[in-house]
């Protein structure tokens, strides 16, 4: 039984093999008939499909007779010759449909390598003809050089996109698209390098920069003349920036297509392009970028020198009011914004970082040192100068000037006209009168304007960087942009220093005014004395008058925010002065005297508080003094327990007085006995 089953199995296998063989022979016959028909009709696409089917049948070990094999080989040779001729004709005729149709035949015919080589050779020859300069590079003008360089970049992009569908659809197995990109890049790069080198040489950028850096500095009366006749570097900078921008756009296009092709490729090998740093084109572009940064440095330096030489006092709009500032601020920020935005627009990371660093250095060092020197001189200038009331009158009170002022809206976009009838800086010596441009309000307004411009510049550059570079931004660009934030911190600290300098000049004036008055003031009052004080205030009204004399000129000329900062600094001085003169060495107080002190402190605090809208800084400055007054005004010592240790002024100011200080204040009240005070338990 087992033997019969085995025999039956062998019979079945032989029958199955015979059927498969017969089927294969029939398929061979049918394919050969279709192949002959297609070749007769010159339908090479279907003929290639039939030939591929015959090769697949042959791979299954199905015997094909010698005659059929000869006919297959002959058909294959005929198809290759035919499609190569037709492909060449279609390429020269720019027949896109025919190129795609014929390209689809190479893969089934198993000679995609020959096809892609033919296409690449044609593309390379055509590209070389299109990119070749019409004459010697030495004879071309600057305009012709830049135009031809842009033509090179655009032609490479056009050829790549034109043949991309063919390479992806028909030659994917042999990395056709990647090889096309590498071939056109290698053909175009030497031409682009020669054009860039010729442009750099013909422009003479290196010599130009060298001469500009070694120009002798003008002195004396020639400074303004030299500044007015200074070279305008912007046209050349714009031209170089455009060249860099085109080169980087081209490089990004090539690298992006390479990444796209590699993502579609089944081959695990790397890119066929040379690395970015090893590219000869990138080497030339880096040289141009270095020269561009050096030229931007020359432009920034020249513009800054011009701004310093032609400095004047200008008015700008601030909250519907005109405030005086130094013209240096507008000039420096104008060139800084132009240079930084131009550098970002190139799309070249190194060039952008280089110029951003130059701008940061200009703002953090050069401009900062100028303003810092003026801040340091504030105390001396204030002591030597006359009253500020008439110092800036010509600028702020002139109706004719107000009509000529153009409002500065945003940084760099609407600059104050150079034809302003502004007050020019007078020549000064160490003992001369205060120059208007060096007046404290001008210095303070200039710092405030710098902070405002820095914020605008930061926002502008961040937006331009996002437009010029891919998201996320390169780390170097982020780092350079953060330098503006560091500069802002430095100017904020400088503004605080300026405020403290002015307050330190006010402090001895206020102290010398208050000390004689307070020495004669008594706070152990009778009813008659208290009533008399209602008519003739002991010191508060006089102190407010003195503060008004000091602050009114600043209020007239300072920006609102800057003036409020100044008032905050003066408030601290006034509060500490009153606390020191009144409460350090306590005089006797009775109930009426404590009420009188509370009224006087309220008058002074209200005057200063109205200037700053009673902000938190104001409440904190008067916090200790007000808490002392609260302790002095209690009806009985036990009333202290109702507020001791709790925040005051609607929770803005924490309790600042220790238990010992509270006891000292209570002991100053003539009505309270030692026993009553000792009975209080302060935690």
Each model region followed by its residue ranges:
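Long, K/E/R/D-enriched contiguous segments that form extended
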Residues: 274-282, 306, 310-340, 344, ...
């Amino acid at each position: 039984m087992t033997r019969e089953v085995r025999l039956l199995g062998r019979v079945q296998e032989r029958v199955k093999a015979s059927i498969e063989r017969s089927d294969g022979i029939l398929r061979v016959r049918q394919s050969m008939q279709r192949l002959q028909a297609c070749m007769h009709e010159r339908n090479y696409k279907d003929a290639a499909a039939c030939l591929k089917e015959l090769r697949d049948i042959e791979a299954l070990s199905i015997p094909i007779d010698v005659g059929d094999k000869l006919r297959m080989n002959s058909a294959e040779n005929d198809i290759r010759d035919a499609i190569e001729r037709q492909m060449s004709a279609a390429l020269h005729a720019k027949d896109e449909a025919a190129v795609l149709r014929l390209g689809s035949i190479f893969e089934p015919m198993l000679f995609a390598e020959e096809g892609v080589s033919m296409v690449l050779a044609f593309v390379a020859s055509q590209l070389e003809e299109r990119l070749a300069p019409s004459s010697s590079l030495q004879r071309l003008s600057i305009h012709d050089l830049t135009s031809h360089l842009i033509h090179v970049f655009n032609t490479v992009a056009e050829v790549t996109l034109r043949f991309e569908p063919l390479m992806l659809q028909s030659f994917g197995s042999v990395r056709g698209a990647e090889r096309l990109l590498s071939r056109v890049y290698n053909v175009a790069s030497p031409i682009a390098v020669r054009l860039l080198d010729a442009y750099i040489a013909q422009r003479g950028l290196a010599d130009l920069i060298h001469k500009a850096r070694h120009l002798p500095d003008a002195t004396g009366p020639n400074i303004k003349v030299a500044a007015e006749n200074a070279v305008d570097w912007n046209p050349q900078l714009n031209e170089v920036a455009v060249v860099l921008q085109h080169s980087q756009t081209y490089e990004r296009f090539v690298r992006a297509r390479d990444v796209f092709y590699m993502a579609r490729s089944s081959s695990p090998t790397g890119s066929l392009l040379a690395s970015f740093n090893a590219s000869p084109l990138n080497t030339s572009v880096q040289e141009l970028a270095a020269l561009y940064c050096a030229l931007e440095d020359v432009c920034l330096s020249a513009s800054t020198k011009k701004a310093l030489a032609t400095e004047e006092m200008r008015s700008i709009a601030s909250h519907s009011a005109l405030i005086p500032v130094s013209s240096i601020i507008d000039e420096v920020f104008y060139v800084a914004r132009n240079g930084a935005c131009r550098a970002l627009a190139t799309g070249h990371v190194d060039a952008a970082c280089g110029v951003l660093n130059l701008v940061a250095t200009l703002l953090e060092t050069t401009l900062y040192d100028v303003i810092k020197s003026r801040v340091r001189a504030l105390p001396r200038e204030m002591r030597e100068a006359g009253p500020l009331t008439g110092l800036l009158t010509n600028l702020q009170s002139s109706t004719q000037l107000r009509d000529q002022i153009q409002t500065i809206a945003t940084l760099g976009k609407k600059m104050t006209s150079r034809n302003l009838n502004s007050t020019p800086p007078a020549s000064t010596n160490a003992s001369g009168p205060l120059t208007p441009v060096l007046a404290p309000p001008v210095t303070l307004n200039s710092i405030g304007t710098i902070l405002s411009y820095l914020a605008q510049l930061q926002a502008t550059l961040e937006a331009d960087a996002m437009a010029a570079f891919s998201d996320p931004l390169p780390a170097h660009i982020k780092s350079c942009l953060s330098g503006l934030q560091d500069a802002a911190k430095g100017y904020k600290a400088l503004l605080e220093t300026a405020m403290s300098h002015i307050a330190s000049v006010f402090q001895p004036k206020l102290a010398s005014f208050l000390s004689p008055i307070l020495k004669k003031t008594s706070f152990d009052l009778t009813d008659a004395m208290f009533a008399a004080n209602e008519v003739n205030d002991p010191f508060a009204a006089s102190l407010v008058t003195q503060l008004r004399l000091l602050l009114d000129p600043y209020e007239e000329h300072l920006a609102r925010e800057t003036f409020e900062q100044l008032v905050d600094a003066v408030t601290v001085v006034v509060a500490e002065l009153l606390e020191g003169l009144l409460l350090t060495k306590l005089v006797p107080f009775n109930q009426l005297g404590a009420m009188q002190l509370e009224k006087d402190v309220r008058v002074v605090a209200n005057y200063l508080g109205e200037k700053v809208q009673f902000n938190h800084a104001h409440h904190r400055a008067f916090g200790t003094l007000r808490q002392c007054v609260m302790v002095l005004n209690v009806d009985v010592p036990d009333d202290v327990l109702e507020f001791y240790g709790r925040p005051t002024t609607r929770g803005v100011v924490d309790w600042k007085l220790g238990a010992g200080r509270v006891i000292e204040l209570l002991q100053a009240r003539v009505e309270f006995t030692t026993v009553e005070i000792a009975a209080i338990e302060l935690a």
